[in-house]
Amino acid sequence: MGWLNLEQKVAIVTGGASGIGRAICEGFAEVGVRVAVADVNGEGARQTADELRDKFGGEHIATTTDVTNKASVDAMAQAVLDAFGRLDILVNNAGINIPRLLVDPAGNEELTEKIWDRVASVNQKGVFLCAQAAARVMIKAGGGVIINMASECGMEGSEGQSVYAGTKAAVYALTRSWAKELGKYKVRVVGIAPGILEATALRSDEYERALAYTRGITVKELRERYKKATIPLRRSGRLSEVADVVCFLASDRSSYIHGTVINVSGGKSRA
């Protein structure tokens, strides 16, 4: 057994077909976890599950899951129970970001009610529905771990992405609240707040252009400023570094970590 003792555990990773989620799936598979790759992109989820089996061996499945739809989330949980008979870990990773300014005097598209509802539905409602479905299974089984994906901007705010920051701030509160509710059932609830990463869905070209625009600088200048001026380690994070923290938090090596959100930001965020 490895140091983490995660062999044969079963984990759901939402948003697992790409970006941080895919890196987490790979990190889990490498240490022997059986992974359910859940994603609204069903083909991407199936491809990821196939690649996990080819690269790491073991049993892995894919589910086409819309985290904003309760029936879809319940079907995801049932598919995992049908395949593995248990659920030990949920990683609430699925999330979206549609950057817009609240008001833009320059005439560019502003934040709209439709955008607000869409981002909040995935980033807040989705976290709630998946956590609820997983918690029901874990309570019956006598324990488990729920890991919620927050963000540094959930504590600090961020120009041009207020709705994203607001939904991620909610993840902090949900993590702490559910920890108080579920601890007595031996279900740990923790969070992770990544900072600036080398390549994720959240750090898209559109995002960088929008953020650079709000600061009146180029995208290249934006990247250099963030690395040199705001990150003490002077570099962006790697997806694998987030996955490593997830694996640790999912293991019994972190058995007394509960109700907190861990920053993975190279020192940029310290709250």
Q: Which ranges hold each PLM region?
A:
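Residue(s) in the substrate-gating loop at a strand-loop-helix junction
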Residues: S151
